[in-house]
Amino acid sequence: LDGIYVSHTDEDHISGVRELLEFVEKDLTSLRIENLILPKWSDIQENKNYRELTELAESAGVRVLTVKAGDEIRYGTVRLKVLWPESTASGKEVNEDAMVLEMISKDFKGLFTGDIGMVTEEKLIQNGCLEDVDFLKTAHHGSRYSTGAEFLEIVRPELAVVSCSATNTYGHPSQDTLERLKKSGSRVLITRDCGAVTIVNGKSVSAFNRIK
C-alpha cells in the first residue's frame, strides 16, 4: 500500500489499522505499507491513541506523515488535496479536527469527510474549497449532525456511502441525513446493509458482504 489515511484517532477508526501495523511489525504478512498519514495536530500529548499509533508505525518501518489544509499528495495522475484540519487545529476536538480529503483523478472526484459535523462543514463552505463531487464518504456514520443541506447543495455527490455497524447504539444513520442525501439526488449505500464498498478507477462500484 502506498499509504493509509487515518482521519482521526477514535477507536472505531484506528483499530483495524493498528492490527494491520502489528502484523507488519511482526512480519506476519507479506503486505507492505509505505506511509501512515495522520492529521497534523498541535496537541497530541494527551491523545494516547495518536501517540501509540505513530510509535507502532515507526516500529513497523512505516513512514509517518502529518498533513493540514492546503497540503497535497500525488500518486501518478491522482491528487489528494487536504481540505482540513486547519493549521491551528489542536486535535482536542477529534471529530471536528478530523482529516478531510478530496481525491481527484481524470474522471473522478471523491470527498472523504471523517467524522466532521456541520460546524466544520460550514467552515469548509466559507473557505470556498468545496466543489461538486462524484463520491462522498458520508461524515460521522450518517449522524444527524453532519452532512447538512447547505453542504450537499455544493458537493452534490452522485454516490454517497454511509459506513456504520448494524449493531451500533447511536441510531446511525439518521433518517434526517438519509433524506437530505436523497433530496440532493444521491444514490446511497449503507455498509450495514451492503457490506464493504469498493470503487475502482472512479468508474465501477462493487459491494461485498462476507457475513452470510
Feature map (PLM): residue ranges:
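Non-globular, low-confidence helical/coil segments that flank catalytic cores
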Residues: 1-212
